[in-house]
């Protein structure tokens, strides 16, 4: 300014001094504004915090003594916002109104007050669940009644200390103690500040169910279908356990086949602690029925060794359902269950026997069902397939591989010993319980076509007859050759299928005897050991006895015996002759009639001369295209079987050809080659003619 004054008259000095005055004024104004703003913010902060505190205190005071959890009831606090907005008339207001009355006072207190309210405010905002305030033991049960709510000192510090006392019981340790030692008066004495855990779900408090928000049980559990496990203890738990400690509702959707009203969660949730005790939860096994009906690999089958579910699985596989379906299996989803690799293991699993061995109504029904014979029995008879009885198929593995190729995969193992992966070749005596799997859709189609015809032999007549469930009469086999019925673990397990046999197997044309697998008796006098020659049909009793016969005879160990060594001494098909035509199976055609060599591609079946009893493994039904290659590979070693790959891969059950010729590398390649076509045009022709009939 001295320089400016020297430079000019007063106007110069004025102009020089003006900017300074302006800047000073501006600075002063800004300072004032900042102070006022700060003071205003402080006041608003105080008001807001005290209002929240007072509101919370009032809520806590009016709230029922059973405060249900460690999270605040956000719904109620939200609905009470109007109260937050409305002015609070209390000693706090009067003391505060006199406190901030002028700018000067604000400015004087500014440095101190700008910090303290924030500090206090954050003190209760920051209290995390594990802060010391939370971890302190809960106050005595009568504290709520002894506290003088109306006489708050004007000092705000005490007010801000209240939240810690209120929130104290929200800590985990306090939860544990209050859960384990509930006192009727004070289960959860006070609410937590909404700012701390605003995510509390509305309507969860036991003491007060907010009408706007349904309780968790109503939301998550359908009252009609699922029992609420904690319903019975609601009265006790409402006063003793914070709802937050309960499992709100683990909604496990039951499989459609499962009774819906079985409680999914056991009521034993009272084990204390803020985490639910999951040890007692029984989750239902994975859906035995695939959600996608076209799905071929059954999740339940995936556990080869968990045979406990096997009968369950079998039921879902349609053994109970599909078997009863009638001529047409409507079980698209039932594609060859055998295709699952794990099935093999389960087959070899002795326990399987137990689960399957008991003739459960389902199994029996499925076996006995007439439709079964065609599709399930029929697709293939393993060397000793006891096709004779559909129920037998139960004993036998009747994999629903409608394509013979499918069965052939099973059959494919010439050396039977290897046929089941699980069965060590000749000596593992694992009783194979029959695994009767329904045929897939292809089977259904086929069975529909065939059943009317009485199983016109779709494959070579013999095969078809087998397919049709024509029982192989093993009784004709010399006893050493004859397969004993499956070694059911307990003789009692014998399937009482005889009654069913007539139904299922005996088609009009079929003598009941043909339905039976004569494992029980020696060769019937009339029967010849070779299937090629017709023999008089035995009494239907055959079926009965063979079926009822304890399956104890069959052992997996015998599979080896399936090695098809002597063609002549092989299995004999029970029916007088399986005529190639539908009659072959006793279909419409006459039962008698020597079999066409075509039928079994010859004595190949007979090759299965089994020196010992062997399980009947019947693969029936469509194997889905995915029929397990492992099974095919396992069976591929059996010297007598050749499966056309087309059937194997494509699931063209009728198209597959079961040939008893030794399987060479080419045969193995065929098995793995999805594109392989049936090599024999004659066979194709017979298939076509079958369809035309």
UniProtKB/Swiss-Prot annotation:
The answer to whether the entry has keyword Transcription regulation is: yes
Motif Nuclear export signal per record, residues:
271-287
Write out the ranges of the annotated region (Disordered). Answer: 1-30, 282-306, 328-554
- GO MF terms held by the record: cAMP response element binding protein binding; transcription coactivator activity
**InterPro entries, per database record:** TORC, TORC_C, TORC_M, TORC_N
One Gene Ontology biological process: positive regulation of CREB transcription factor activity
Q: Which residues carry this modification: N-acetylalanine?
A: 2
> Where is this chain's protein located in or outside the cell?
Cytoplasm; Nucleus
Q: What does this protein do?
A: Transcriptional coactivator for CREB1 which activates transcription through both consensus and variant cAMP response element (CRE) sites. Acts as a coactivator, in the SIK/TORC signaling pathway, being active when dephosphorylated and acts independently of CREB1 'Ser-133' phosphorylation. Enhances the interaction of CREB1 with TAF4. Regulates gluconeogenesis as a component of the LKB1/AMPK/TORC2 signaling pathway. Regulates the expression of specific genes such as the steroidogenic gene, StAR. Potent coactivator of PPARGC1A and inducer of mitochondrial biogenesis in muscle cells.
Family per similarity comment: Belongs to the TORC family.
Protein's recorded name: CREB-regulated transcription coactivator 2
Organism of derivation: Homo sapiens
Gene (name only)? CRTC2
């Amino acid at each position: 300014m001295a320089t400016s004054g020297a430079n000019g008259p007063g106007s110069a000095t004025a102009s020089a001094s003006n900017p300074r005055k302006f800047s000073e004024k501006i600075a002063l104004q800004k300072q004032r504004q900042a102070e006022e703003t700060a003071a205003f913010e402080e006041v608003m902060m105080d008001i807001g915090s005290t209002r929240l505190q007072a509101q919370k205190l009032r809520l806590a005071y009016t709230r029922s003594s059973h405060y249900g959890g460690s999270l605040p009831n956000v719904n109620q606090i939200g609905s009470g916002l109007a109260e937050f907005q409305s002015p609070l008339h209390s000693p706090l207001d009067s003391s505060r109104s006199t406190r901030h009355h002028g700018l000067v006072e604000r400015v004087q207190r500014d440095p101190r007050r700008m910090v303290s309210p924030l500090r206090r405010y954050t003190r209760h905002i920051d209290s995390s669940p594990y802060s010391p305030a939370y971890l302190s033991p809960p106050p005595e049960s009568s504290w709520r009644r002894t506290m003088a709510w109306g006489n708050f000192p004007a000092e705000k510090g005490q007010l801000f200390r209240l939240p810690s006392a209120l929130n104290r019981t929200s800590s985990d340790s306090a939860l544990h103690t209050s859960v384990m030692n509930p006192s009727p008066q004070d289960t959860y004495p006070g609410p937590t500040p909404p700012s701390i855990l605003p995510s509390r779900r509305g309507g969860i408090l036991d003491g007060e169910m907010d009408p706007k928000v349904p309780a968790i049980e109503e939301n998550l559990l359908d009252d009609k279908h699922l029992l609420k496990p904690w319903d019975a203890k609601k009265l006790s738990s409402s006063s003793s356990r914070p709802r937050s400690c309960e499992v709100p509702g683990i909604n496990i959707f039951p499989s459609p086949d499962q009774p819906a009203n079985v409680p999914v969660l056991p009521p034993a949730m009272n084990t204390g602690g803020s985490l639910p005790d999951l040890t007692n939860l029984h989750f239902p096994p994975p859906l035995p029925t695939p959600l996608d009906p076209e799905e071929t690999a059954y999740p339940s089958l995936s556990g080869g060794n968990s045979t406990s579910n096997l009968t369950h699985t079998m039921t879902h596989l349609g053994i109970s359902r599909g078997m009863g379906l009638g001529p047409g299996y409507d079980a698209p989803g039932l594609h060859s269950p055998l295709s699952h690799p794990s099935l093999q293991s389960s087959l070899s699993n002795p326990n399987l026997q137990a689960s399957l061995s008991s003739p459960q109504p389902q199994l029996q029904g499925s076996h006995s069902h007439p439709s079964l014979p065609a599709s399930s029995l029929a697709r293939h008879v393993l060397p000793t397939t006891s096709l004779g009885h559909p129920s037998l198929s139960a004993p036998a593995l009747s994999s629903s591989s409608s394509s013979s190729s499918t069965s052939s995969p099973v059959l494919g193992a010439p050396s039977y010993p290897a046929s089941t992966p699980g069965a060590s070749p000749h000596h593992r005596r694992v009783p194979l319980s029959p695994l009767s799997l329904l045929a897939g859709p292809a089977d259904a189609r086929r069975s529909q076509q065939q059943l009317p015809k009485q199983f016109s032999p779709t494959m070579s007549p013999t095969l078809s007859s087998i397919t049709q469930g024509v029982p192989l009469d093993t009784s004709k086999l010399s006893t050493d050759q004859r397969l004993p019925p499956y070694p059911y673990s307990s003789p009692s397990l014998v399937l009482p299928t005889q009654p069913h046999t007539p139904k299922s197997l005996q088609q009009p044309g079929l003598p009941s005897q043909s339905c039976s697998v004569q494992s029980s008796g020696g060769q019937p006098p009339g029967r010849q050991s070779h299937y090629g020659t017709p023999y008089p049909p035995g009494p239907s009793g055959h079926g009965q006895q063979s079926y009822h016969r304890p399956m104890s005879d069959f052992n997996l160990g015998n599979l080896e015996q399936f090695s098809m060594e002597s063609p002549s001494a092989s299995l004999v098909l029970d029916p007088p002759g399986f005529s190639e035509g539908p009659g072959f199976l006793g279909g419409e055609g006459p039962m008698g009639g020597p079999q066409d060599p075509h039928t079994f591609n010859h004595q190949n079946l007979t090759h299965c001369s089994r020196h010992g009893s062997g399980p009947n493994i019947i693969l029936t039904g469509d194997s889905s295209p995915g029929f397990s290659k492992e099974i095919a590979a396992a069976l591929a070693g059996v010297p007598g079987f050749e499966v056309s790959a087309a059937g194997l891969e494509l699931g063209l059950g009728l198209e597959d050809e079961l040939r008893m010729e030794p399987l060479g590398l080419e045969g193995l390649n065929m098995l793995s080659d999805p594109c392989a076509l049936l090599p024999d045009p004659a066979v194709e022709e017979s298939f076509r003619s079958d369809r035309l009939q």
